[in-house]
Amino acid sequence: MNLDQYLPVLLFILVGIGVGVVPLVLGYVLGPNRPDAAKNSPYECGFEAFEDARMKFDVRYYLVAILFILFDLEIAFLFPWAVALHEVGMTGFVAVIVFLAILVVGFAYEWKKGALDWE
């Protein structure tokens, strides 16, 4: 097996890692590091924090965020199908209809369970 064909891929990976790591290392090495109490305190619109800045969030925020990401990701799977609509034929069409039916069943289940209600 000829490994010379993989040299551009290796170079691409190394450059990508370097673009991410080199600025971090340079900032850590060359940047000033003078922590004090004012820099480490929470900042709220120019005022001292009235209460603890770390507050608990309601679980519903996380639930809505997870549901959004889930359905957004599932809808993103439809774009390649739409691009290749003519090539996939009837089999691809039936597969997408089954996929959309599963999405609708999941959405109806979440709606019935009250995951989308704010009370």
From Swiss-Prot:
This is NADH-quinone oxidoreductase subunit A. The chain crosses the membrane at residues 9-29, 63-83, 88-108. One of its GO terms (molecular function) is NADH:ubiquinone reductase (non-electrogenic) activity. Keywords: Cell inner membrane, Cell membrane, Membrane, NAD, Quinone, Translocase, Transmembrane, Transmembrane helix, Transport, Ubiquinone. It is found in: Cell inner membrane. It comes from Paracidovorax citrulli (strain AAC00-1). NDH-1 is composed of 14 different subunits. Subunits NuoA, H, J, K, L, M, N constitute the membrane sector of the complex. It comes from the Bacteria. It catalyses: a quinone + NADH + 5 H(+)(in) = a quinol + NAD(+) + 4 H(+)(out). Its EC number is 7.1.1.-. InterPro entries: NAD(P)H_OxRDtase_bac/plastid, NADH_UbQ/plastoQ_OxRdtase_su3, NDAH_ubi_oxred_su3_sf. GO terms for cellular component: NADH dehydrogenase complex; plasma membrane. The keyword DNA-binding does not apply. Signal peptide: none annotated. It is a multi-pass membrane protein. Belongs to the complex I subunit 3 family. NDH-1 shuttles electrons from NADH, via FMN and iron-sulfur (Fe-S) centers, to quinones in the respiratory chain. The immediate electron acceptor for the enzyme in this species is believed to be ubiquinone. Couples the redox reaction to proton translocation (for every two electrons transferred, four hydrogen ions are translocated across the cytoplasmic membrane), and thus conserves the redox energy in a proton gradient. The lineage of its organism: Bacteria, Pseudomonadati, Pseudomonadota, Betaproteobacteria, Burkholderiales.
